[in-house]
Every structure is written in structure tokens, then in C-alpha cells.
């Protein structure tokens, strides 16, 4: 066995660190403008999904990431319901280079938040007396790569607020 000696101070750990601190709903809304009449119609829905992510640096090495899912469902030409959730998380992220930090905030964290947002939307929709809303998984890595390509072509640099 070998003994390692230190000068009394713990060696500083510069290895990358990531941990979830909190997952929470930041905002939630549901509108069914044509109820109760919409419930008496034949159900032939069309679904439009819009998603967006935002991130901002908090104190120290903490970051907030917010995933917004907005769903508009029409039955024929009429809006059956509009539902939106802002699912947020606070993450401790340390010792990452700029590229890894950008990817973590732009793809990895939204991947963590998506199942929570999807379940919240589904619960909200069924409580509104509509059929379950089964959203397909989203490839945030591909969306992140597309956004980085778009920014590169536009001569923009990724930023972390």
C-alpha cells in the first residue's frame, strides 16, 4: 500500500460535476374554448406542438433550464384545447468547457425535463375530459445540433445567460 500525503488541504476536484437540484412546474395553463359543445362532436383531432428551451445562470455553478411545451389541438377547424407547461429544473454544473456546457444546457437538461412535462400535459388534458395526449419522445440532441448549425451559418455564437 502506498500512503499519500497532503498538506492538510483537500485537493481541489476539477472533474466535471452534474446534479439535479430541483424539478418543478414554473407555469401551467389549459383552455378549452369550445367546451362543452366540443364533447358532442366526432373526435378527429389534429395536434400542433411547439417546444422551446431557455436557460439562465443562477448564483455560483447553478443553472435554471426551462422547457416549454405548447399544444394546440383542433377538432376539424375548431380549437378543442390549448395546453402549455413550463417545466423547469435547477442543475448544479461545474467544470465543463464552453462546448460541453452549451450541450448540457441545450440538450441534456431538456432530455431530463421532457418526461415530467409530457406527464404534466397528459394529466392536464385528461382532467379537461379529453383523450390522453401521448407525445412522442423528442431528440433534443438532434434539435441542439440543428440549432448550432443554424447559428454557425448565421455567424452567431451560442450564449449562456
Curated annotation (Swiss-Prot):
GO MF entries: unfolded protein binding
Gene3D superfamilies: SecB-like
Source domain of life: Bacteria
A GO BP annotation: protein transport
GO cellular component, one term: cytoplasm
Main location: cytoplasm
Pfam families: SecB
Subcellular location per the Swiss-Prot or TrEMBL entry: Cytoplasm
Alphabetically ordered keywords of this record: Chaperone, Cytoplasm, Protein transport, Translocation, Transport
Function: One of the proteins required for the normal export of preproteins out of the cell cytoplasm. It is a molecular chaperone that binds to a subset of precursor proteins, maintaining them in a translocation-competent state. It also specifically binds to its receptor SecA.
Family: Belongs to the SecB family.
Oligomer and partners: Homotetramer, a dimer of dimers. One homotetramer interacts with 1 SecA dimer.
UniProt-listed PANTHER family: PROTEIN-EXPORT PROTEIN SECB (PTHR36918:SF1), PTHR36918
Name listed for the protein in its UniProt record: Protein-export protein SecB
Organism: Pseudomonas putida (strain W619)
Lineage: Bacteria, Pseudomonadati, Pseudomonadota, Gammaproteobacteria, Pseudomonadales
Gene: secB
Amino acid at each position: 500500500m502506498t500512503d499519500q500525503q497532503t498538506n492538510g488541504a483537500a485537493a481541489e476536484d476539477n472533474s466535471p460535476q452534474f446534479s439535479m437540484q430541483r424539478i418543478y412546474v414554473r407555469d401551467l395553463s389549459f383552455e378549452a374554448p369550445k367546451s362543452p359543445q366540443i364533447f358532442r362532436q366526432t373526435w378527429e383531432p389534429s395536434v400542433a406542438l411547439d417546444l422551446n428551451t431557455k436557460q439562465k445562470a443562477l448564483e455560483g455553478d447553478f443553472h435554471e433550464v426551462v422547457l416549454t411545451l405548447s399544444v394546440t389541438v383542433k377538432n376539424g377547424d375548431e380549437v378543442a384545447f390549448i395546453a402549455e407547461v413550463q417545466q423547469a429544473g435547477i442543475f448544479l454544473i461545474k467544470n465543463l468547457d464552453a462546448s460541453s456546457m452549451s450541450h448540457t444546457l441545450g440538450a441534456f437538461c431538456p432530455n431530463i425535463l421532457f418526461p415530467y412535462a409530457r406527464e404534466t400535459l397528459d394529466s392536464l388534458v385528461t382532467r379537461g375530459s379529453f383523450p390522453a395526449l401521448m407525445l412522442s419522445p423528442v431528440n433534443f440532441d438532434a434539435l441542439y445540433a440543428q440549432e448550432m448549425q443554424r447559428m454557425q451559418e448565421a455567424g452567431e455564437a451560442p450564449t449562456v445567460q
